[in-house]
Amino acid sequence: MAEQLRFDGQVVVVTGAGGGLGKAYCLFFGSRGASVVVNDLGASFKGEGNSTKAADVVVNEIKAAGGKAVANYDSVENGDKIIETAIKEFGRIDILINNAGILRDISFKNMKDEDWDLIFKVHVKGSYKTARAAWPYFRKQKFGRVINTASAAGLFGNFGQANYSAAKLGMVGFTETLAKEGLKYNIISNVIAPIAASRMTETVMPPDLLALMKPEWVVPLVAVLVHKNNTSETGSIFEVGGGHVAKLRWERSSGLLLKADESYTPGAIIKKWDQVTDFSNPQYPTGPNDFLALLEESLKLGPNDPGEKVDFKGRVALVTGGGAGIGRAYCLAFARAGASVVVNDLVNPDDVVNEIKKMGGKAVGAKFSAEDGDAVVKAAIDAFGRVDIVVNNAGILRDKAFHNMDDSLWDPVMNVHARGTYKVTKAAWPYFLKQKYGRVLNTTSTSGIYGNFGQANYSAAKCAILGFSRAIALEGAKYNIYVNTIAPNAGTAMTKTILPEELVQAFKPDYVAPLVLALCSDKVPKKPTGGLYEVGSGWCGQTRWQRSGGHGFPVDVPLTPEEVVKHWNDIVTFDSRADHPEKASDSIEKIMANMENRVGEGKSGAAENEHLAAIKKFTGVEGKGTEYTFTERDVCLYNLGIGAKRTDIKYIFEGNEDFEVVPTFGVIPPFNTEMPFSFDDIVPNFSPMMLLHGEQYLEVRKYPIPTSGRLVSKGKLLEVVDKGSAAIVKQGITTFNAETGEELFYNEMTVFLRGCGGFGGQKKPADRGASTAANKPPARSPDAVVEVQTTEEQAAIYRLSGDYNPLHVDPAFAKVGGFKVPILHGLCSFGIAGKAVYEKYGKFKNIKVRFAGTVNPGQTLVTEMWKEGNKVVFQTKVKETGKLAISGAAAELA
């Protein structure tokens, strides 16, 4: 048996420890020999009120079990007093767990300064104050352990949490810097993104999911990270909850390198955009790219193809910090491209304004601090009547080693960078919403992304800006407001203080501006919002998260730190199981996939053989028929459900001589067909919540399709593929006319079952011709494009054709699945796309799609079609996000 991890003789400080995760930390460390400082203000999850009771209850519980503990009731912004309690009571401080937090969730358009400031006071400044107070003791004793707390909302952004997302991602940059500064003193710092029930989350998680999100699933990971045995895992980011533990790291694309001269234009970048986002040969960095080497390579290249000119005529661009350096370069570039420019600078905007006017452009100055965002934006409105583009560039440096950092260095950096970015964007937001157009370009830095010595304040602020950007990108997408973030490498007034002059000259701001203009244009071809890009010296690349495959622990057995240690390599190794999460629901999905991982229900080798035997038994065996009766009313309802309008008489009026049903209706009759097998028979750990509809294939075996009648569908199992952590099940269903016996439709449905693999089944799916064809779109512009805007009621109408899954109508159920709102049925998107193909090219004998992403009712579906002989290859995108909803799709014409 593994030796128990103990904390005897050590002192642990836990903030926000009156309940939930904080309480679980305290009880654990108290039981493992540590002396515990239980800090809790006793406020509500919104940060209101205070009470000493919560901390006292936890202290008494620890003492009753024979442990040592003391309560502290200070707010975390008085972190020095919290650490003082540890020193006075126990004489030392070894481990600091910054867990205190509040929520002030509200849509960005309705957010008030108080909502922003309170979140930052508790999450960001509180973590800084406690860590700063503990740091001298850590350095002196050459031992310290820090855990800071981020969240999925911080890592990916989340609706209604612009403040919280910013604060939580700020913790990542802060932690990375502490890790770098502390390493030589054996001060280990890590950050976790926990999914755990607490006073905060009880208002936003359904009760059944809350029950599975016990804080006890988080504590063992933290125990391993703060134990004295951990001397190397530092500056790391972990996702944890519900038995799932994984590590995240930054992944940087190989990017696009162009010649850094006057031919380096926005159009040149856009023309080769695929290279910007090419992750085929990625880097896994802990700091900036080698820009000197890139600059040398860039200068060897020939002139760039300028591509399509980016035109900003009629647009108003506001640039903060626009009076010098990189901000000046932005202002001049926008002016040259036809924009009216608002030059914001606290010191001197006038020189740049005059420079623009001298070259025939339009510009006004706005001499305000970025913190006075209302005044900055008012200057744009007063001068030009509108604002279209905001580039948040203003910044200051107050660098100092963390042990010398104080509030006079921390607060100004946080105020100018994070709060200034929030204030200017917030002031512009109502205008963006009204005109249904806005472009925001925010500025992080490699210090924020990766941390940097002497820049704990700057790193936290810059990473917070990225979290803020990701959250408002989600909120703005439906209003055509795009938000992106760059980490520029250029010589500026700020960097002059830390770079030699010759390097400052080499890293011209002119080599950053083209990407800024590209991102603020309407020309970015894929995923035009929510991106993070590094740029400089003629190079630009995208940076994203990579997540390890991690390890899933059984949810019916208490998790211990010793068990975490046993599986540590699985948790931290980035192998073929690694993926690239993009949204908060990607965290929930991993945790939900682990919910059926139970020792008590585990399958032995014999049981696995039972699954294989069941697959063999049921494959190809046809089930008894399931009847489906439909009328012209059902035809009208289906057509309306996939987007038919009141003007489409032949789809909605049974009295029309051309009355018909769209051929994709063929997926409806077999929908509830009784199959001759159950999923429990053929795969382990089956749960309906783990089922994803992967692909759909439909053959229309007889035209014209009747508009009423009695049909019978018979189904059979075609194959089961074992993907290790999941299973793929393919079913075939034939639909007959009950009166004549004629075959009308044949469907193949492919479902993906998370957590149901590993039973020793076949590893690769069979080639089944048209139903499994890859259908890669040709490398040319589409031959036809059809846009259909869905309504917010689309799913509510479509479900009446037979798919009553509450995921598509019940907000509470959708939230359990990790979605902000009920999503559109995949087969509804299939119908909309199939209708586009049918109306453009006529009858098809078969149609196949792969479901590549979700669609929210109200979003616009864009179907792009390429005719290749008798085959129409197509794909369907969500216009508002640029993401694919349907891929690998084609229809063979009849």
From Swiss-Prot:
Keyword entries, A-Z: Fatty acid metabolism, Isomerase, Lipid metabolism, Lyase, Multifunctional enzyme, NADP, Oxidoreductase, Peroxisome, Repeat
Subcellular location: Peroxisome
Region span, Disordered: 763-782
Catalytic activity: a (3R)-3-hydroxyacyl-CoA = a (2E)-enoyl-CoA + H2O; a (3R)-3-hydroxyacyl-CoA + NAD(+) = a 3-oxoacyl-CoA + NADH + H(+)
Entry annotated with the keyword NADP: yes
Domain of life (superkingdom): Eukaryota
InterPro entries with a match to the protein in the record: HotDog_dom_sf, MaoC-like_dom, MFE-2_N, NAD(P)-bd_dom_sf, Peroxisomal_Beta-Oxidation, Sc_DH/Rdtase_CS, SDR_fam
GO molecular function, one term: isomerase activity
Coiled coil: none
Amino acids binding NADP(+): 14, 53, 99, 132, 164, 168, 197
Pfam families reported in the protein's UniProt record: adh_short (PF00106), MaoC_dehydratas (PF01575), MFE-2_hydrat-2_N (PF22622)
Any one cellular-component term (Gene Ontology): peroxisome
EC number(s) given by UniProt: 4.2.1.119, 1.1.1.n12
Catalytic site positions: 164 (proton acceptor), 168 (lowers pka of active site tyr), 458 (proton acceptor)
Pathway(s) annotated for this protein in UniProt: Lipid metabolism; fatty acid beta-oxidation
CDD domains for the chain: HDE_HSD (cd03448), hydroxyacyl-CoA-like_DH_SDR_c-like (cd05353)
Short-chain dehydrogenase like 2: region residues: 311-523
Chain ranges of the MaoC-like domain: 776-887
GO BP of this protein: fatty acid beta-oxidation
Stretches for region Short-chain dehydrogenase like 1: 6-230
Family to which the UniProt record says this protein belongs: Belongs to the short-chain dehydrogenases/reductases (SDR) family.
Subunit structure: Monomer.
Known function: Second trifunctional enzyme acting on the beta-oxidation pathway for fatty acids, possessing hydratase-dehydrogenase-epimerase activities. Converts trans-2-enoyl-CoA via D-3-hydroxyacyl-CoA to 3-ketoacyl-CoA.
Record-linked PANTHER family: DEHYDROGENASES, SHORT CHAIN, SCP2 DOMAIN-CONTAINING PROTEIN
Domain remark in the UniProt entry: Contains two SDR domains.
Protein name: Peroxisomal hydratase-dehydrogenase-epimerase
Species name: Neurospora crassa (strain ATCC 24698 / 74-OR23-1A / CBS 708.71 / DSM 1257 / FGSC 987)
The organism's taxonomic lineage, starting at the top: Eukaryota, Fungi, Dikarya, Ascomycota, Pezizomycotina
Encoding gene (name): fox-2
